[in-house]
UniProtKB/Swiss-Prot annotation:
Its cofactor is Mg(2+); K(+). It catalyses: L-methionine + ATP + H2O = S-adenosyl-L-methionine + phosphate + diphosphate. The keyword Aminoacyl-tRNA synthetase does not apply. Mg(2+) binds at E10. It comes from Saccharomyces cerevisiae (strain ATCC 204508 / S288c) (Baker's yeast). This is S-adenosylmethionine synthase 1. GO terms for biological process: methionine metabolic process; negative regulation of stress granule assembly; one-carbon metabolic process; S-adenosylmethionine biosynthetic process. The gene is SAM1.
Amino acid sequence: MAGTFLFTSESVGEGHPDKICDQVSDAILDACLAEDPHSKVACETAAKTGMIMVFGEITTKAQLDYQKIVRDTIKKIGYDDSAKGFDYKTCNVLVAIEQQSPDIAQGVHEEKDLEDIGAGDQGIMFGYATDETPEGLPLTILLAHKLNMAMADARRDGSLAWLRPDTKTQVTVEYKDDHGRWVPQRIDTVVVSAQHADEITTEDLRAQLKSEIIEKVIPRDMLDENTKYFIQPSGRFVIGGPQGDAGLTGRKIIVDAYGGASSVGGGAFSGKDYSKVDRSAAYAARWVAKSLVAAGLCKRVQVQFSYAIGIAEPLSLHVDTYGTATKSDEEIIDIISKNFDLRPGVLVKELDLARPIYLPTASYGHFTNQEYPWEKPKTLKF
């Protein structure tokens, strides 16, 4: 189609080894916050065959049973039998956790009022929103997430009992560029790979994934005779999860955010409490971007914040409205400054971040579930 372009995003399921690690890290964070909302948590996880290792720095009053937290998380994901390549009952759980460095503590939060706590580190964070879907997310990443969600649901309800937790999806959308606004035209390509039980044939698997997952998730009017399907392109995928690949927390930051439609600051989200602006300020940036689009100030926008360790106020604000705005970028920055207090100690209150809410964010993107406070646009005064 003339005047159009292709854009692609990928997603991974709960049983992908990197996503296992994200979920374990956030399960530990939630366990800390459930007992001590002031916990300082920086928890990383690594996974390989028969082994989970959690390591990092945690200062908390919570009494944690790391073995139980890790095993319960893996059980919930669905790795409950060695035949699936991983078993929560028999895997080794290694723990190497120390307390937060006192050098960081004195520079960031000790002897400071909540509103004045500094950023936990330097860094840059991006937020993005678009009017192409009700969720304010690119259609590419939204559909990729929904395909993985549908496979998890079909695995759990038994309708596709041969499915295993490690799944991957990728969706290519053909867009029209309407003066900077992205307007979806059709689905160009769908890629689905799924770990499976040994007994199902590749032919049956492909047919069932197409009819029971793809055609039920993707709007029928977006599919046409030219849509390309790559379902289980490798053929066999019995060995998956940590047995197939090593996993690490924080290796799926594009999946977690905007599917490549926006710049990424580089800091991962999972396993970090609100004092880490990698997470809290990225959530705030999403909140700001979504609020700007909801207010009709633009059709698509990316915002950037930067922080320095120990300093509460952001060092810089930048916006890119891609030519879709009703006001200048300078005016929009002024609107942001007058409507949002972006200090971490204020964000924790406005977005209610000192709660055990993080484990669900570690699957299917941090900006997909519309019930989170950062997904609810703020009414702007301008």
